[in-house]
Amino acid sequence: MRRAEAVTGGGPVRGPRTGRPTLEEVAERAGVSRATVSRVVNGQTTVAEGLRQAVEAAANELGYVPHAAARSLVTHRTDSVALILPESPNRVFSDDQFFPSVIRGVASELDAAGKLLVLLTTGSAEARSRAERYAVGGHVDGVMFASLHDADLLPELMLRRGVPVVCNGLPHLAAPCIDVDHLGGVQAAVEFLLAKGRRRIATVAGPQDMVAGRARLDGYRQALAAADRRAIVAVGDFTAESGHAAMRQLLADEPELDAVFVASDLMAHGALQALREAGRSVPGDVSVVGFDDIALATYCDPPLTTVRQPIAEIGRSMARAMLRLLEGHEVEPLTILPTELVIRESA
């Protein structure tokens, strides 16, 4: 069999030219000094309108773009903000819709303000070190954190280095924090199940090294204690796999349970699968309530009753707080966004 040969045509392909227009070339084209061009491109308002227009016209003709690093030395601004997610890329870019919703909220606000979003994942020690060097090295104007774990020291380190910080999930930091009403949302869910006549209400709690995991478990315990009911607890890590495993554990430990509050919709999806495998009907045998109201909740079988938290609004609120910090304004130390119970067919 004859081998096909590669066909080439023309000369070698070269990369883009490395010589970029300089301030001096713009100044010569505009007929002004280099200092005048520098003031115009750095946004200073002390330049006469006619000179500014001449500089802008010359820059457009030459295709001049200000060098970001050099400009930041003058303005002390990079016009970019980092969002750090202390998870692995595999977790952030998975079927967990919490992260894309937060990113979308942050990006929409920063884009409207003319700022760039820098996304960093720090699921390993090496990634955390890289993020630390990047942020404290002056590459961004501020850092936002979401999905924080107790052991994560980066927020405190950033604050000590003078980096503006906004977080979701660690209210004890000396930085603005955006969170949701975990307690109120969970208590509404448990009270709904009690009103339905459910007597043995279990929970699949979230990770206990996160504020969301602890607060939702606290809300569950408080609501059951008020009704003089016993807590039945298994713990997951906000993944579907952990919800499946925790539900199997609950059925083995408490076969008579008739309801379960699951601390995330993704874990609830896994719990529903475990209930089907065990031959339990939902909501006939066991009622199920989740937390998040991500798109998955409407696709579950049956559609999931859940506590809606405004995930994209968490991102938008974080970005707005950061923009206010960067402008030198005061920001509320703690913002709590409301939750609401969305009733569907699983309970």
Residue ranges and their predicted role:
Residues 1-79, 347:
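N-terminal helix-turn-helix DNA-binding module of bacterial transcription factors
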Residues 248, 253-347:
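Flexible loop/turn connectors
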